[in-house]
Amino acid sequence: MNLSPIQEEIVNTSGNLIVRASAGTGKTHTMVSKIAKEINENRTHKVVAAITFTIKAAQEIKDRLSVDVTRHFIGTNNSFVIEEIIKPFMKDVYGSDYDLDMSTDYSKEAKVDTFSEAIEKIKTEGILCSYTDNKKNFIFELAQEIMEKSTACRLYLQAKYFKIYIDEYQDCDESMHKLFMYLCDTLKIKTFVVGDEKQSIYIWRGAHPDAFVSIWGKSNFTSKFMGDNFRSCKQIQNYSNLLYDETRNLYSPTPELNNIMWLSTTSTAWASEALKYIDPNKKSALLRFSNDNTRLGAGELSANGVDYTYIPQTPIAEITTDTAWLYSAIAKYLIIEKYSAYDLISEIPVEGNETHKIVSTIKKMLKNVEQSVNDENNFYLATNDLATYLGYATKNEHLKKLFETVTDKKYHVAFEPDKYQHVAITFHSSKGLEFEQVIVFAEDYRLSDVSSLCNHYVAVTRAKSKLIIVKQNSYNANCFQVNLEKLFAKSGVKINDVLVQI
């Protein structure tokens, strides 16, 4: 894929750089191109760290890179600070009692209220946990303290890394932001930041989009804006651009407005009305806020003649220990026909306890897991054997969730959503996906706060050629309409200038 002029500018800009990348602008392609170029041009012993929010995103970066990344760190935010700061240097700050094996457990049962309780949990149980208050971040608070107090830690990071790349920065919380800026401003490690405050859908769990905005004005950063949406048609671009001050200037009227339909309808008629404007031969998605509304919506659309597949959240999606990736990989191995032992091996995190295991042994153990799916106890034993071999610990409640995921076929669709022409999913699960046609409900977005506005922006920018907004007569839906009119009015635009009301 060729680079656009602004993408080339970003790839060729040296030093600290922040990129504001609107939806559909080719952010990942640009970042991967930049990482590859700067690794190839590096003439020192130093390496890079590419830091993401999910193992899936890290794997996508690894898969796309055409250069050897064996020595480089490509992984999640938490794994970076745990493996590079906490595990090797905690003993420098807290003493030899903390020179021990550590594992993570962010489950509800392991949560604590205070920093001192979390420190004690490491000492007594070897567990890195999280706070009861999900807007506070113990892991990054601890890493920050260690980094500030351990000279060896600071020297190690400075000697090892020549650049750090941070993806989806709008989802960073305040503790993450403080640590990353310490790496940049104090340790002088060059930093590349990419994000978009318009897509911050995790404010409820502590995401702090203002942190991203604050870097935009820093004198030691060059800033670039990617606004060309290669996914959505011009009319949908207009609609999404009018939602935010910084993109309103990108609005330009279009002669045809049929790509966005506003349906004023009822709870009994919405499905049949919406399907009048859906092409059954093109992929589409119903995006709702709650799982219940998503499931019910799929049923109503299906009852009206177009089969919509509800994509549920799987039981294993709730698991937050370091073994979570393995449960997911085992499920994919058992559910997806073309997913092999080699695919599982490729997913072993770079920060894992051991990545150089014998392929034949892993294949044999996976076969044992597969052959035990009809016996829950044997399934637990076979899965635990594989986890132990790879250096990971299991919990019975998590093994139960995995067994439920692989034996209850209603969850299988969640592992191969691309197989289905028409799907119904929550918009939180739709981040990073795209569909020709999208149906959203006005009542899911009051547009009265930052979180609601971000959620709506993410949902509508999943659509490529058709957006259907279902407006029923409810308080939330009426708030949506009033607030949308106010947002559009800032550009002197009315709703009817942007879409067709039915």
Protein language model regions, located:
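The feature marks helicase ATPase cores and/or their adjacent C-terminal helical subdomains
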Residues: 1-502
